[in-house]
Amino acid sequence: MTLNATPTPSPKLLEPKDHTLILIDFQSQMAFATKSIDAVNLRNNAALISHGAKGFGVSTILTTVAEKSFSGPMFSEITEAFPGQPLFDRTSMNTWEDAAVIGEVNRIGKKRIVLAGLWTGVCIVGPALSAIAQGFEVYVIADACGDVSDEAHNRAMDRMVQAGAQPMTSVQYLLELQRDWARSETYDMTTGIAKKFAGSYGIGITYAKSMFGASEGH
């Protein structure tokens, strides 16, 4: 049988309107003990996906655990991207067991769930496995998650992937939403977010535009 290639994307690729992003427990108490990623990279990656999601109009849920009594506020890099958006504060370590959060998931009504947060082995594994068990497609932004050790993070990622979750990175998430530099309506936003938060890739964009007036869409 001869295969016939067509210039069309895989249905596995994310679109801005086909998923819900859930940002979980990006809070001081969890960050203090996170060792699998340094705090600077973690905050940059959290900011990148937050500003990307906001700019592309992705349905986003922000949730914390014991914010006032133990864990502290959500990272300002995230809340600044979603000014005025309410946060769902929980007692459950597994976000998927919180009725208010699940009510919001159902209200939004998307079959794809993208997860990021702290810690990978507790507050990300729980909702990932639970959502998969209920028939949702789950994606996990691995470098916008963290745990108390590399071992804890890596084993959690292994467990989720073995259950059917699809791993990705923060820059991959942003560029998957853009996907075509000819999409001029989001071009400046995407490159602006990358310049600010995407490390050496962002430096490269700044250099190319400054030195050569580069524009990827042409």
PLM regions: where:
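A contiguous pocket-lining binding segment that forms or flanks enzyme active sites
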Residues: K111-S170
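Distinct, well-ordered alpha-helical segments
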Residues: S71-I78, V101-I102, P127-L129
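Active-site acidic carboxylates
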Residues: M1-S92, R107, E137, M157-V161, ...
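Beta-hairpin (beta-strand-turn-beta-strand) motif
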Residues: V65, T91-M93, L118-W119, D143
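Glycine-rich phosphate-binding loop signature in dinucleotide/nucleotide-binding domains
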Residues: V105-K111
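Short phosphate-binding loop-to-helix
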Residues: R90-G103
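Short alpha-helical
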Residues: S69-F70, W96, V122
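Glycine-rich phosphate-binding loop at the start of an alpha helix
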Residues: A47, A99, G121-V125
